[in-house]
Amino acid sequence: MKKKCLILFKWPNYLNKYLISKLSNFYEVEHLFISNYKNENFSQTVDKINSTIEYKKIEIVFFDVDFAKFMNFFFINRIKKVKKVMVTYDDYAVHEMNAITANSCDIILCQCPLSTLKYREKGYESYWMPPENDANIFKNYNLNKEIDVLFFGQLRNDRKKFIDFLIDNGIKVKIVGHESNWATEEELIKLISKSKIVLNFSKSLGETVTNYAAADIYKFHYQLKGRLIQSGLCGTLCISEYSPGQEMIFNEKEIPMFRTQDECLEIVNRYLSNNELLKKHSNHFSSKMLELYEEKVNFKPIYKAIDQPTFKKVELVAIPYWYVRIAAKQIIKKNISIWNMLSSFSQLKQVLKVLEKSSIYVQLLVTIETILNILWYSIKSIKSKN
């Protein structure tokens, strides 16, 4: 009999279905969205989730934490009597915050193997889990390879410059997923199957890399992208911009990597001009993906780890001021309005619990800011309704 698990998503997202599908192979799965708890304050949200866990006899909860500042260390600690698994897809951007949130969980699952090592370095039990690696969804249709180069995704930042450079040098590139040129999931998978090469870019897409601890510092990071996994499962070679995550699991023959436009053009031309080389490396890449990284293979050690009775814990010396400040603000902002200001003030005791192990200086600063936030966001709620 399958154990029951609950996925606590922050809000609806296209990646959610992959996690639901993945876990359904191993567990009886329920899911909730934090964004649906619009009329509940912090305490009420926690109580409702705990009631659901008890009523449905949930044994494991998976927390979708990226950019969900409400779903932090203090919130997760209030979820009782279950094994807790943190899931992160964008850890490159929010690792400093996630690494503290992780302390409230038993297992950490990362989209990138580099992030997995970062958590292990701190003593956490962490595993690599790509979201889009289900061979029942992403499969090779064995179609005629009539598309030279396929790119699917948004043409932001310098992606367009790379693609324009290829086109200007005589390479035929099919672009899907930009502006109105969309395809269904099934259409996209068939397009990948009929392509000789899938082109992947690794730079993050935001204007800067989010930094909750201070001002943003970096313009981008090099990420491991899902296109690599999808391409391999569909039997197509992926040529990719460099990222350290993919370098950890693939070599140059499995995924040729470039950094510059000239390197990209040279690699594309090398494979398009040599069908035997293209076929050989495509087959090797696809075989490795299916044998080592396909969903059922990849998740087995994770399932075994979650099933263990006890977990090692990492001791935090302190939780930094910036993190405590964010957590306190999230407690107060939950369902705040001028009409329920008294309820918001009642949540001050939850903020004081957050501050229990902080210095007197931090307690004073955060308490004063919390009172001001209650007043400010209550007044602001009137303006937003007018």
Residue map of PLM features:
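Generic beta-sheet signal
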Residues: 87-89, 111, 129, 152, ...
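Catalytic binding pocket for nucleotide-activated donors in carbohydrate/polymer assembly enzymes
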Residues: 9-26, 31-39, 113, 182-314, ...
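Extended catalytic core of nucleotide-activated donor transferases of GT-like folds
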Residues: 5-124, 137-138, 372, 376-379
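Local beta-strand N-terminus motif with an aromatic residue
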Residues: 57-58, 105, 147, 195, ...
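C-terminal amphipathic helix plus adjacent low-complexity
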Residues: 276-386
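P-loop/Walker A phosphate-binding loop and immediately adjacent motor/lid segment at beta-alpha junctions
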Residues: 76, 121-134, 214-215, 234-236
